[in-house]
Amino acid sequence: MAHYFKVDLDEEFERFMKELSDDSFENSNKTPRQPNEDNKEMKKKDPVPWWIAEDDFEDDGLLGTNVSYLKTKKTYQPVMDTEEESAEKVQFLKSSGTSILSVDSLEANELVVSEPHHSTLGLGLDTLEEQEEKEQFFARLEKGLTSSIDYSKLNQELDSDDSAQLKALHRYPRNTEPAEDGCENESEQEELPETYSDDFEDAEDADDPLITKDEETHPKENSESGKDSFPKQEEEKTGMLANVVLLDSFDSVEDVGLSSQEKATPKAKAPPEITDDGPAETGVPYGQSSGDTEALHQAYCHVAHSLGDTGEPRIEASTVQTVRSSIKDGLQENEESSKNVSTTESDLPTVEELMQPIRIDSYGIRAFDLQPISLKKATDSKEAESVGSLPLKTNTNTVSQDTRHAIQFPHKHDESVVLHRTADEGMGSSCPATEEHLDKMYLEILKKKTSVNPSLLPQDDKMNQTSRSQLGAGEEVPVIGKQVPCKKARSTPSLPKRKPQSGLYASARSSGYGKPSSPLQLFSALEKKTSKDNTKTKSVRSIPTSNQFRKREILSGTKLIKPAASNKPSPHREGSPATPKRPEDPSDDSFVQLQTEPLGSYGGNREKELLMLKRAQDAEEKWTGAQALMEQMKMTFCEKEKELENTVESLKRQQERELFRLNQENYILQAKLSSFEETSRKQRWLQFGETSDPLTGEKLKQIQKEIQEQETLLQGYQQENERLYNQVKDLQEQNKKNEERMFKENQNLFSELASLKEQMHKNHFLSQAVENTEPTKNQSFTDLLAELRAAQKEKNHLMEDIKRLKQDKQALEVDLEKVKRERDQAKDQIAYATGEKLYEIKILEETHKQEVSRLQKRLQWYAENQELLDRDAARLREANEETEKLRLEIEKLKTESGSPATQQRLRSKERALDAKRIQDLERQVKEMEGILKRRYPNSLPALILAASAAGDSVDRNTVEFMERRIKKLEADLEGKDEEAKKSLRTMEQQFQKMKIQYEQRLEEQEQLLAHRQKEAPQSQRNSSSRLKALETELGDIKEAHQITVRKLEAEIDVLKHQNADLEHKKNDKGDQGLQSIEFQVEQAQARAKLARLNEELAAKGREIQDLTKTVERLQKERRMMLSRQIPRSREETAAKRLKKDPNRGHGNAFPETLDGKLYHPHTFTDSHISEVLEENYRLRSELEGLILERSKLKMESEAAVCQLENSMKRVKDDAAAHIASLKASHEREIEKLLCQNAIENSSSKVAELNRKIATQEVLLKHFQGQVNELQGKQESLAVSQVREEILQKQITKLLEELKEAKENHTPEMKHFMGLERKIKQMEMRHRQREQELQQIIQQTRQVVETEQNKEVEKWKRLAQLKNRELDKFRTELDSILDVLRELHRQGVVVPMALAGEENTAEF
């Protein structure tokens, strides 16, 4: 594998040499002799050469005019073999301890596309900037700006020792940190393809380091396998050093040796490092001659031989080769990615961004890239940034060397070798403690950074202080190889594109001839290149140096902001030299010895550097102000978003509440409807069950309740509909208000954005104008570029915020649409529910009507049936009466016809029975008397028996008679009850019949009334129009008559005057007078004619004016109509023509004219005659209509004039009447006064009588006038009364109609109101009938009560008779008992047997 790698490197280098066609390769024929020398020198010499020492790692940005670069390897990877080669490289690099750059993070999926076109970045590292500077230099030279440059002095400076010393300061960090950054970007490419970070704040602070997957998974294996593989590759790598020769391109082999020596110090435990930002730089000076390059090449060969003698330098050389290979891989891929990235506006770094770390490193910012990796991966990019500013110089003298060796540039090989060896020995022990200490330092710096705004210079000062204090305390910084996996980071944001370089080798680094020799010009040129990363980092690594030269370097370097990838803690190699203990005093002797020359050369740049610092601070202040504005904007955006969300949520809540309430109301209405249906069903069943029964009050009450429930339901539905309609309106208004408010807020936000953009542009232009006035144009240009990048970044942030807000707005609009849809659904549901309810109500009404009609038909049928039944009942009554009469007659006849025989028989029977009874009784009496006489001569039982026997016969007869009478009366009562029931039923049927007839009659009358009401307004309108027409005609006639009368009167007056004049002048003139009279008459006639003609002329002028106005209006309307119709007709005709000939439409598609007007072929074509005729007919009809309107208006005006004249007449008449009345009253008063005077003055009777007569006459006249007035007033009063009655009726009618219109919004309500009225009328009639029925019932009750009272009285009388009889009997019994007592007293004994017999007889 090592051999393969070496061969590959050789092939790549040869190819690179062939491709380079720059002027700097004119002396390339000097290269062949040097590879062997390099091999020999490396084999001979053990010690490290003089130019590799710790001060290479203390690189303080002293590159100046002699920055050198190393050309990178360019690998040719075919598209098909990428996977196999990448696998082989992974295995090889794992074994060799180098990192793998599979795909650069900046290039996502374009690798396969861009691989065949091999990278041109390998041709030269910083050639884009250099070529640009070269162009500027030659432009200045043409203008005569650079005439003051001394080229001999420049060449002397370039050939001096400082060039060799300074170029060595940047090699190790330049090769290590780019490797680290490459690692970082590669891992992101592998893990996050085609993705980039939107988190610009994090990207501003720092970008996390990236690593490959192989490094993530096998960090320890890499480090261990690196130990094993280095010894195997020693010889081959040292052989390769000799082949790397660049003469006039100034990418010399010196750096290869340097980098190999620098990286060979670790004991084969170096972690894989690849570049993200560009190829590793070599220390080639900008303006070296070919002689200088030869000397450098010889020195490199010497170094190679010295390294080749020992085993350890060979190992170190092999590490250099592996690192170089990894660097070249990374560079190639970076270049490939830069091709694709630079054209887009993504956040991926461009070619210039990749090149920038080289320029920054040349200023000494790289000196701190060797950082210890904390065991915690939680340290973020800010920690890395702050730690990046620490002076992590490798300590080469931890055991026995003096600090002087660590500070000054070494000139002896032995010292440097000893330094490296001692550094290697002292590494193992110092690692853990220093790592912990560095972690603490990271945290402290983080706290400081978070507490202070990130400005460039203050942070640099703080970093310098902390680094000096820490390293002045003598603490070692561990760099012993811990393989630490690089963090995944977001890719760096994109920078503005550079001006593309044209040419085949546009990216090749030229020799640097024509570079400005003064350090200030170099700084400005470098600053212009490196300031593109101004906005991405917030701190710059400053290196504390012990001399004034380095201080100035730091001051000038503060303007150069660290690129994104340089902020990360780089993975460190085991055995790399640690930093020495630095004295805090910058004026140490060792530093003074070394840096005397640069002090003199850079003495005049302090003021400019201070100006740059001030400008940097101003730019940072502007940037912080813009950031604060952006934060305010974000806050306002967030607040408005929250407000919008709150409003949307409140709307949703309101709609949910309304839906809930509507559901509740629907539920209530459904429950009411169900209850109503149940009641209606019950009523139907009751109606079906009780059809045969008479219509009672309960049914009417049920119907009334039903109607009331229906009314309440309808009212509820009506109110619900109105309320829902109002709610819907309110919701619509709320939605409109919300939309308007949101639109206003969006407009405000857009206006704020526009104002911010304008402010940014103003700031940008102001800063640009200020910086253009300053002498350092290049520096101001870089500042402006940095500000522009910051503004673009802010703009991108704002655009993203706008996009996000637009998305939020769209989401809110979607939510609003949903809410609207829900609202519409709720409306539809409500409408559906109300429609259903109305439909059900209509169905119920129809069923109710049907039932009512059915019941009415039944009632009608019952009424008709009742008539038949009444007739039948009357016939039956007549028949019964006749039968009873006949029966009575028959009984009478029977009694009359069969009386003698029956009477004789009855008498004979009765006689026989009476005889037997008499015999039995007599016998019994005799027996009893005998017994009584025997036993008890005065005993009562016999007497009692005799009395009871006589009483029984009498009682039986009476009882039978009474029973018969009662039965007869009961039968009569039953008959009367039946008759009453029948009569009631007949009355009910007659009532129903009358009711039906009455309702029919009412309906007919209502229909007639409605018909008449419909006809009445028409007739009224006709009559009113006729009246108006007649009134207008009458007014016209009156006016004409009055005008003629006036004219005639005027003429008569004129003639009278003329007559008078003539009579006066008759005597004087005679014939002349006659002529003058004729002449005057003619003159009068002419004047009258003139006046008449003037009047006619004025009238005609008015008519002409009216007609001109109407004509103008019609013309305007015609123009409007034509302007509307012509485009339509043209479009129609064009459409018809296109339909007929579709190819013509395509063929006429000519470009627009210069004025931008389209050619319309139908614009000036004549319209069809039919269209013209139609237009003419339409205009005529419009003119006729207008004439009619004018005539109507004339009529109305004439009517108004007539009314005015009438009113004037009335006023005049009233005034005349009033004056007459006043005159009459005045005369009366005068007469009264005269009468009083006469009465007072005269004393005779005649005068008194005359006065009385006069007064009586006056009174009579007065009374007559009053009577006449009263008669006139009576007539007018009668007319006014009639009018008032008519008007009152009309007003009442209109009020009723208005009331009906107000109450009855819908025809259903009107119908229900009619039903309600009918029901009220029915109720009134029902009450009246009930009252009549109650009267009838009361009458019948009175009759029955009277009869009952009669019966009761009769029975009372009977009872009284019985009581009297009983009293008589008692008295008789008392007398008998007295007789018996007397007998008993006398001693007469009544026998007991007789008593027993009497008892048996009783039983």
Swiss-Prot record:
Modified residues (Phosphoserine): S160, S163
GO cellular component term of the entry, any: centriolar satellite
Listed Basic residues bias regions: 485-500
Annotated Basic and acidic residues bias: 35-46, 210-238, 526-536, 571-585, 1128-1144
Top-rank lineage group of the source organism: Eukaryota
Acidic residues biased stretches: 178-208
Region of interest (Disordered), ranges: 20-46, 169-243, 256-292, 306-348, 453-606, 1126-1147
Coiled-coil residue windows: 614-1124, 1174-1386
Keywords: Cilium biogenesis/degradation, Coiled coil, Cytoplasm, Cytoskeleton, Microtubule, Nucleus, Phosphoprotein
Subcellular location: Cytoplasm, Cytoskeleton, Microtubule organizing center, Centrosome, Centriole; Cytoplasm, Cytoskeleton, Spindle; Nucleus
GO BP annotations, alphabetical order: cilium assembly
InterPro entries linked: CEP162-like
Protein family membership: Belongs to the CEP162 family.
Summary of the function given for this chain in its UniProt record: Required to promote assembly of the transition zone in primary cilia. Acts by specifically recognizing and binding the axonemal microtubule. Localizes to the distal ends of centrioles before ciliogenesis and directly binds to axonemal microtubule, thereby promoting and restricting transition zone formation specifically at the cilia base. Required to mediate CEP290 association with microtubules.
Protein name in UniProt: Centrosomal protein of 162 kDa
The organism of origin for this protein: Mus musculus
Lineage: Eukaryota, Metazoa, Chordata, Craniata, Vertebrata
Gene name of the encoded protein: Cep162
